[in-house]
């Protein structure tokens, strides 16, 4: 395994099997994206109220959302990157709303597991620096997440 993933399930609604699939899926994505071995990621499964508060406090949007990610290795303006080959990178945290994932799975007509996988990959790509603020960025990121999910076998 490339990634060290720390799961926290505040909802007690995600099974060990589902966490194992997410772990395998993100390790597959990490391999495709050439992520260094030992990289660390935190994944929290929360309810809508918890993600609403996070979304309000960090993004200024007072409403629940499906996934939020916080990259830890991002450099701010004027910051210098400190590289140490012996320290595995701390990629950051992915926070997923379980009620939103269930709602969206039903809305899009696919399984809860597929939606959970989609949200995990989406958050993971954000940790790696991908974004969708412009049309071009969106095209690249969404194509990448679709490719990862399809190649892994987690299709709609």
From Swiss-Prot:
It is found in: Cytoplasm. HAMAP family: Endoribonucl_YbeY. One of its GO terms (biological process) is rRNA processing. The keyword Nuclease applies. Zn(2+) binds at residues 122, 126, 132. Single strand-specific metallo-endoribonuclease involved in late-stage 70S ribosome quality control and in maturation of the 3' terminus of the 16S rRNA. This is Endoribonuclease YbeY. The gene is ybeY. Its cofactor is Zn(2+). Its EC number is 3.1.-.-. The keyword Plastid does not apply. GO terms for molecular function: metalloendopeptidase activity; RNA endonuclease activity; zinc ion binding. Binds 1 zinc ion. It is an enzyme of class 3 (hydrolase). GO terms for cellular component: cytoplasm. Coiled coil: none annotated. Keywords: Cytoplasm, Endonuclease, Hydrolase, Metal-binding, Nuclease, Ribosome biogenesis, rRNA processing, Zinc. It comes from Geobacillus sp. (strain WCH70). Gene3D superfamilies: Metalloproteases ('zincins'), catalytic domain. The lineage of its organism: Bacteria, Bacillati, Bacillota, Bacilli, Bacillales.
């Amino acid at each position: 395994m490339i990634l060290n993933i720390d799961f926290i399930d505040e909802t007690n609604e995600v099974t060990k099997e589902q966490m194992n699939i997410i772990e395998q899926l993100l390790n597959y994505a990490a391999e495709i994206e050439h992520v260094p071995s030992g990289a660390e990621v935190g994944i929290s499964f929360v309810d809508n109220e918890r993600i609403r508060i996070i979304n309000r406090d960090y993004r200024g949007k007072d409403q629940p959302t499906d996934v939020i990610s916080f990259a830890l290795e991002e450099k701010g303006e004027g910051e210098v990157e400190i590289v140490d080959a012996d320290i595995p990178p701390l990629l950051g945290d992915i926070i997923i709303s379980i009620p939103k994932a269930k709602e969206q799975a039903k809305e899009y007509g696919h399984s809860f597991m597929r939606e959970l996988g989609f949200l995990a990959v989406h958050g993971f790509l954000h940790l790696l620096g991908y974004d969708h603020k412009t049309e071009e960025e969106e095209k690249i990121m969404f194509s990448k997440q679709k490719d990862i999910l399809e190649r892994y076998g987690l299709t709609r």
